[in-house]
């Protein structure tokens, strides 16, 4: 009874909630959708449920690990931002050392699952994505360079490629398109956040594009990246990996997103409201494409660009 009372206590519940929050569940959920999309696109209807579950769980734990460690690294700048100033690593509700140990444990477990159940190429992409996010982006680029978003976009594009390569074991044209497509999507998505969170980033002296080089350049980059994203997304059906349904969805969502981005050039536009709309529709776009490519796959024969034997 004493053990049960302990786990039901408000203090324990708050502590448990804090550990969950440092893993950023929203980011994990978004990555789950993209991993599943990449996996099912590659599986082409022949789904190994054990492999799929291992890919989803393993990658989710790796993402959770990266997010937890990012909380530790960013605690000084998080303290300066209204959105993040109440994170447990800032308030001290949970010791930074405990969060770091928790994050490392999640990473070990996640990578172990990927190593045991997937293949060397899927594991390699997960490792590279993790190193880029934690080691390159979080530790240095985010704080010191306007190109931090560009570097971080690679790690954000890794999950669907891990899902895809878990099935194929090779880096073919389909995997390359996914990597480029999701990297391009990250840019306007992130710049939109930087615009409607402008004051936070400025207060923390983080050199995101709107802060470092102005709103005008950020708006232009958003429009250009969405336009290129639309073209790259169309390569999946053009290369025969998906069918007409994916082409219809990618054209509809990408063009609507582009039209929404162009509204940023209207005279007197409310930049905060506009950026939130661009951000919100970016999530709708990538979710719709992930779901559609999982359902509208086509059987193609492609020579691998890279193959690693497990």
UniProtKB/Swiss-Prot annotation:
Keyword Transcription (UniProt): no
Cited InterPro entries: Protohaem_IX_farnesylTrfase, UbiA_prenyltransferase, UbiA_prenylTrfase_CS, UbiA_sf
Membrane disposition: Multi-pass membrane protein
Enzyme class: transferase
Main location: membrane
EC number: 2.5.1.141
Source organism superkingdom: Bacteria
Bilayer-spanning residue ranges: 25-45, 49-69, 87-107, 120-139, 145-165, 176-196, 220-240, 242-262, 277-297
UniProt pathway annotation: Porphyrin-containing compound metabolism; heme O biosynthesis; heme O from protoheme: step 1/1
Keyword terms of this UniProt record: Cell inner membrane, Cell membrane, Heme biosynthesis, Membrane, Transferase, Transmembrane, Transmembrane helix
GO biological process entries: heme O biosynthetic process
Subcellular localization(s) per the UniProt record: Cell inner membrane
CDD domains xrefs: PT_UbiA_Cox10
GO terms assigned for molecular function: protoheme IX farnesyltransferase activity
HAMAP family hit by this protein: CyoE_CtaB
Function in brief: Converts heme B (protoheme IX) to heme O by substitution of the vinyl group on carbon 2 of heme B porphyrin ring with a hydroxyethyl farnesyl side group.
Protein name: Protoheme IX farnesyltransferase 2
């Amino acid at each position: 009874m004493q053990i049960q009372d302990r786990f039901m206590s408000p203090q324990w519940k708050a502590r448990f909630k804090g550990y969950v929050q440092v893993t950023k569940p929203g980011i994990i959920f978004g990555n789950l959708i993209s991993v599943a999309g990449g996996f099912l696109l590659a599986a082409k209807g022949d789904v190994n449920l054990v492999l799929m579950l291992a890919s989803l769980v393993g990658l989710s734990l790796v993402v959770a690990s990266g997010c937890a460690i990012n909380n530790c690294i960013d605690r000084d700048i998080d303290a300066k931002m209204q959105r993040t100033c109440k994170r447990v690593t800032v308030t001290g509700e949970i010791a930074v050392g405990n969060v770091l140990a928790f994050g490392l444990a999640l990473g070990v477990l996640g990578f172990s699952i990927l190593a045991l159940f997937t293949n060397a190429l899927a594991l390699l992409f997960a490792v590279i994505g993790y190193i880029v996010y934690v080691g390159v982006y979080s530790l240095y680029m985010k704080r010191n360079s306007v190109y931090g978003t560009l570097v971080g976009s690679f790690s954000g594009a890794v999950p669907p490629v891990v899902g895809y390569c878990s099935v194929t074991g090779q880096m073919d044209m389909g995997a390359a398109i996914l990597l480029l497509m999701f990297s391009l999507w990250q840019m306007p998505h992130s710049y939109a956040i930087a615009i409607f969170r402008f004051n936070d980033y400025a207060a923390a002296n983080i050199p995101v594009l709107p802060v470092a080089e102005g709103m005008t350049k950020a708006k232009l980059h958003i429009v250009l990246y969405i336009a290129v994203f639309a073209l790259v997304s169309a390569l999946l059906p053009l290369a025969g990996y998906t069918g007409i349904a994916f082409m219809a969805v990618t054209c509809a969502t990408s063009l609507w997103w582009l039209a929404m981005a162009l509204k940023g050039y209207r005279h007197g536009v409310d930049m905060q409201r506009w950026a939130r709309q661009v951000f919100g529709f970016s999530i709708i776009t990538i979710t719709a494409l992930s779901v559609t490519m999982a359902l509208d796959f086509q059987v193609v024969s492609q020579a691998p660009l890279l193959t690693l034997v497990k």
